[in-house]
Every structure is written in structure tokens, then in C-alpha cells.
């Protein structure tokens, strides 16, 4: 039932009021939605010209708020979208310069600013928001006039990023850090000082530089240029950007080889804030933070004479964040309370693995030598693994410094800085770690002085070279014989070891027959002093086999070695069993330890393997005690002691023992030696003195050849120098001339050993002459 009269009129009035309210609300909602859709639409790519600037100007005037225009560098094209900006902010302009006739190629970015802030409508007037100064990055001379301040350079070579709604302003923090080594001084080095760019300006965080490969005019040049970008703050957010690039040049004068390295860090931090319209005490800003990080490393390596524009940089991204944080560098004048922070350079990034160029990286090899003396020939005593057959073409001559502290061979090759003149050869110090590489290089370069120095090191350390397959295995047969003969150069001397077990002391003395004087040679280590020890020389080394050591006279199997060319004592492989009072002889490059107390076994030492092995023992029905042994014609002869009437002969080729011609008498045999194919046996008689018997290899018969009349002769031991047999005792030293026709004792009595403390053990060593300097390794 419809209302009538006054009720109907009131009802119609109420319906009209309700409809108006509903229609007004719907219209307001539609307008709001349309406005939001209009404001949130993606901005089209803006052209670089007057149209784009006019559009930005109109939008800025309509909103009443200044905007910041940003252009991202090429490496950040995939990052977040940037805010639309007003005419106040500018984008970096591209600059490309390639001069075919010039010494360099430069590709970088340039910027210019045209800041004229305007505000209309409800926007609040603010002034003094930063400086209108700008920065003109380095450019080539052909485009220097086009990139001047206030000009409009050519369009850039990278697209502009999109924009976002003005209702959600953002703050952006971007930084880049890079370093580039190599090249020549740029034409802008002496230009006018750089100025700070305007607010909101952002430049590419990295530029590509291609430096010349052949630089001989300057040495060790370096420069650094930095670009710092300002900051523009708004009421609800901030846009902050910073960009810097470091360029350092290290170029050696006249160097045909160059290495270029470029590393950069780009970090983008974007803060998106939303404004709360409601009044109250709750926070007015809420937003999101986007953090992006990009690190790239590049390297270009060139060898020889190449064209100036053939460099190729390889980027290696790294997922690790930079070690330091980057902040803002400048603040807006009108909003000083909203801006804070300081510009801070990030630390140098950790670069990825370097690419290999032409087989191996020259950066990891040539640039390590100056700061790593292990790769040079100057230090003493270092050990460096030597490849058996190094690459002949991989040994350069010179090197530059580097920042890498690690030392490692590159492509299996070690590099050395060596003198190329004979006058500088005496200053070189080699060791066993580099002698073969230096020898190979010296033979290739025909450097006789350096080759002789390498042979000298090998000969003075022959035992170590013999045990090293990387050195001895690569030498030819002639070179092996050469280093051995070089070790035996010099003059043979009678060397006597005075061993005193009671005082645990001992020493070596050599006898100078020209001046009839004894000279001290070296001290024996306490470990090598023992009772009943034996000595022998092999390859001009003195070997000492221990006897009984300590107060309890415990048998010892230790063996020691002395190098007279370097003056160094060392310990070698011990015996398989202790042998006090054994006889030690050298035959065919091996040592033989024969018998000992209550022993008839024999051991053989191989110096190349540093190992003792058992050899065929003496015949089972013999008992070797206080015997003597010598070597003749690659055979070992043993007699004396309990073998008074027997003579045993050992053949190293057949590895067996034979019984020789029966000899000897009731007198005690003191010593037996071999000279010029004859065996000489010295027997002691208390009443008659010393009787000398000789046996030839052809007749194999013993006969008396000489006597020395003296009552109660002292015991002695013999050593042979040329054709002289020295009989060394505690109280006297006799000399016997082993002449093939008329063997005899020398009438002149020699000077006795000075103040003997213990047992005297003679041997023969070849000592260098005083005018030959020795190398201690």
C-alpha cells in the first residue's frame, strides 16, 4: 500500500536524498579508482628531447612534488623500476670515442644537468635543494665540446628504465667500485677539476677502458678519479645514489707484455614507502626494501705486439656480498632532517678465478716474481719442486710486482730473473730446487757462466742430486760424469779423524805435505763419536759408521756423512745391524760394511737409494775379528786378525767370495792397501819392527819388499794418496813410496799428528783450492 498525501511527499524526499548520497559515493569511488589506475599506469619509454622534458614538467606541476629522474647503468637493467623524475634530475649521457690512429679506445658515460625547479598548486615552495654543479666524466677529444656543461649530448646507448607511481616514492642507494690496471695517461688527466653533479644524478657504475699494449714512455704511472653523486630527498622518501671508479696504471718501460685487470662492485638498495592518510600517533610510513648486488671481474692479457683495440674483458659475477656497506654522500638543503649518512668506499672485492690466456695466465706468473723472492735465484736454502722436463718456451726473463702473496708454479713452470752477462754470474746463488731449470735455460741461451754455476751446485751437492730423480734422471750420461769429475777437482789430502769416545769429542785434520803441517778441517758431531767406528770416503764424502756408544758401550747402527765442499754433516740410512770394529770400503759406487765383532755378514749401501742391503757373507768357516780390507781392480780383499793365513777375494760383478793365495805369518797384520795393481801388507814384529809384503795380480805370490827397523812399533792405519802410503800412528807418521820397481820407506820422518785424544782413523779427501769459492746450500 503506497503512502498518500503528506506521507508520500516525505517518502519521495527521503528517496531523493538517499539516491543522491549513493550516487555521490559511487561517483567518488569511480573517480578514485580511475585516478589510481591513471597514476599507477607504466610510463612509456621517454625520448631524449623536449617532449620527454615537457611531460615530466607537467606531471611534476600537477602533483606538486618534485620527482627524480634516474637512468640505470647497463649492468643494472634488470633491477627494480625507478621513479619518474622531473626536469631537475638527469640521466647519464653516453660518450663513445674510438680513434683508429690514437693510442687508446674509451667508452664511458657523460652527464649534463639542467636544473630549473618549478612548483605550482598546493606544492610547498622549497629552495636551496643542493648545488647545480655537475660532473663531466672523461671523454675523448673529439666529443669534448659536445659534453660540456649545460649541453645536450648524444642519446645514450642504453635504454631508460620504467617509472612507478608518485604515491609510493622510493629511495635508491647505488654504488660502484672498480679498478683498472694498465694503459696510458688519459687526455683528461690535466683538465679542470671535477665538480659535484646535481641532486638525483646517477652515472653508470662502471666504464670500459681499453689501454694501449705498447707503452714505453712512462713507467709506474697511476691516477685515480672519483665521481660522487648527490642526494635528493622528498617528504615521504629519498633517492640517493653514488658512483665512483678507480683507475690505476702500472706500465713498465719497454715491456711488450701487458696485463689489464678490471673489477667492480655494484650494489643497489631500494626503499619503497607508503603514506598513511589517517591522522594519529601510529607510524605514517610503511614500505619495502629491495637489495641487489652485482660483482664483476675482468682481465685482459696480451703478449707481444698487438693492436691497441684487441682487448677482451671477461666478466665473472660473484654471488658474495661486498664486505662494506655503501651510503649517501650529500644531503638536500630543504630537508636536512630527513637526510643522514656519509659516503663510504667499499673494500676491494674478492675476484673470481682468472681466465687462462694462451695456455697459462701470465698475471699469476710474471707479476709474482718481485714480491716473492722464492721464485728468484737470490735467496739461500729454499726448496722448490723442480719439474723433470720443464717447458722450454715458458721461461720469461722479466716480471713485475703483484699483490698475490701465494707462491705456486703456473702451468708446471717456474720463472726466474737471471743475469744475462758473465760479469753478473758470480752474484747468482742457486740451490737444488732450481739448478736444473737454470741449467736448461742456460744451455738454450748459450750462457756459459750460468751453466757452469749450475754444474757447480750439482757437483758440490752430488749426493742429493743422485737421490733426486727430477734432477739426476734428466741429466745425460756425459753430464753425470761431468758433475762427478767436477766434484773430484782439487788436490787430494790425507785426512785423519781423531775420535775420543771418553770425551764425546772428535775432529778432522788434513795434512799438507808441502809445508809438513796439520790443519784443522772440521769438528765431528757428538753423535758420530763412538768406540770401534769405521770411516771411508765415497764420491768425496766422508762416511762414518758408528761402533759402541754411551757409557754402557751399546752397539749402534747409525751412519753419518760429511761433505767437505759445503762443510755440512748429515745422517744417512742406518745399518740393518750394528757392526762395531767392522771394515768399511768403497767399491763401484757402493759402500761395503764387512764383518764386525762376532759377525761374518756383509752389508752394502746404495747412495742413490739411501738404503743398506745384505750382501753375500764371508765363508761360514771363517771368523773375522780385527781384520783388514782393501779394494783393487773392482775386487775386495780381506785378511788379518783371525784370518791370519787366509786371503779372501770378493767380486762385485759375480757377488761371491773366493779364497786367495795363502799368505801371512805369525806376525800381526796391521794394515793392507792396494796401489797400482799391487797389494801391500804391513806386519808388525816387536823385535824387528815393520815388514812390508807385496802381492802382484799376475803371480799371486806374497814376498817381502821393504822393512822399517824400530823396536816395539806402535799400531797404525794406512791411507793412500797417489803412490804414497801414509802410516798414521799416535806417536809417529811414516810415509811409504809404493814404487813398482823399488818400494821403500821415505827417510824423512813426517810431523806426527798434533795432540791426539783418541783413535786415529786416516782417509783421503779431495779439498778445493783456496781460490775456488764454494756455495753453501
Swiss-Prot record:
Disulfide topology: none
Biased composition (Basic and acidic residues): 113-127
UniProt KW keywords: Glycoprotein, Kelch repeat, Membrane, Phosphoprotein, Repeat, Transmembrane, Transmembrane helix
Keyword Glycoprotein: yes
Each Kelch repeat, start to end: 328-374, 492-538, 541-589, 590-632, 635-677
Biased composition range(s): Gly residues: 326-336
This protein's record includes keyword Transmembrane: yes
Subcellular locations according to the entry: Membrane
Entry-linked PANTHER family: BTB_2 DOMAIN-CONTAINING PROTEIN, KELCH DOMAIN-CONTAINING PROTEIN 7A
Protein known as: Kelch domain-containing protein 7A
